[in-house]
């Protein structure tokens, strides 16, 4: 029997990379999983790849009506939620002198506002106020990166929110933690760096203490730990999955 047998999980941003790997991990461990994504074709491909015990729901977490639709579906079909992996997010490079209002609004709409209401609207679905919430942060929220300040600020905001949420949730058994990846080989990572990817990978081999970038599966393992009873006395922590990058 898997450690998530009988559990219902939601993974936002579950169509590729870390989200997809985590959804697959949850299913492999016995959970029924809902995944979200903004593009139906990518959602369909992810559902087919996972293969069983999964439902895809199209939506944009920055739109509250999409979140309401999502949670209505989960409530009607399963009646509860045990695990929430609030993973959906975006990021792009723009140096200070080129930051636009559109970039700031879009990044904070999805990464911050979207995550706030993803978590808030899930609370009523946790049975007997018991469950685990994991929020995707980033090493960019803790260390500086050229041209990445807006994204970094949005992830630092999530870290601050979680510190406060654990106080708001005192008296329940709902735990909230942050998983903060460093460089992880995902489709989004490829898209972010484009032609500079090989240079980035070589730089990582020289600067990351582990000597490499990570894989989505390595992050999924950390999320699985935080979602499980194995981490029952952990709440409010930030677990870095970064090969030691943020520690030096």
Curated annotation (Swiss-Prot):
Keywords, alphabetical: Oxidoreductase
Keyword hit for Oxidoreductase: yes
Catalytic class of the enzyme: oxidoreductase
Binding-site residues, substrate: 138
Single GO MF annotation: oxidoreductase activity, acting on NAD(P)H, oxygen as acceptor
Xref: Pfam families: adh_short_C2 (PF13561)
EC number: 1.-.-.-
Active site: 151
Residues binding NADP(+), per UniProt: 12-19
Family: Belongs to the short-chain dehydrogenases/reductases (SDR) family.
Protein name: Uncharacterized oxidoreductase YkvO
């Amino acid at each position: 029997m898997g450690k998530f047998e009988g559990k219902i999980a939601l993974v936002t941003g579950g169509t590729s990379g870390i989200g997809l790997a985590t959804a697959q991990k949850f299913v492999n461990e016995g959970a029924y999983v809902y995944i979200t994504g903004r593009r139906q074709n990518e959602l369909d491909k992810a559902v087919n790849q996972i293969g069983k015990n999964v439902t895809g729901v199209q939506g944009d977490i920055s739109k509250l009506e999409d979140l309401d639709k999502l949670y209505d579906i989960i409530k009607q079909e399963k009646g509860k939620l045990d695990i929430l992996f609030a993973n959906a997010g975006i990021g792009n490079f723009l140096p200070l002198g080129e930051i636009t209002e559109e970039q700031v609004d879009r990044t904070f709409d999805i990464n911050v506002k979207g995550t706030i209401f993803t978590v808030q609207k899930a609370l009523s679905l946790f049975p007997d106020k018991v469950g685990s919430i994991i929020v995707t942060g980033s090493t960019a929220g803790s260390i500086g990166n050229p041209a990445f300040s807006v994204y970094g600020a949005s992830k630092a905001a999530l870290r601050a929110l979680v510190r406060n949420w654990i106080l708001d949730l005192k008296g329940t058994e709902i735990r909230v933690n942050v998983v903060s990846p460093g460089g992880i080989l995902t489709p989004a990572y490829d898209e972010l760096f484009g032609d500079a990817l090989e240079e980035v990978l070589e730089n990582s081999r020289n600067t990351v203490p582990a000597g490499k970038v990570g894989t989505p599966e390595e992050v999924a393992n950390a999320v699985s730990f935080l979602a499980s009873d194995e981490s029952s006395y952990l709440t409010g922590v930030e677990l870095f999955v970064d090969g030691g990058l943020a520690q030096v």
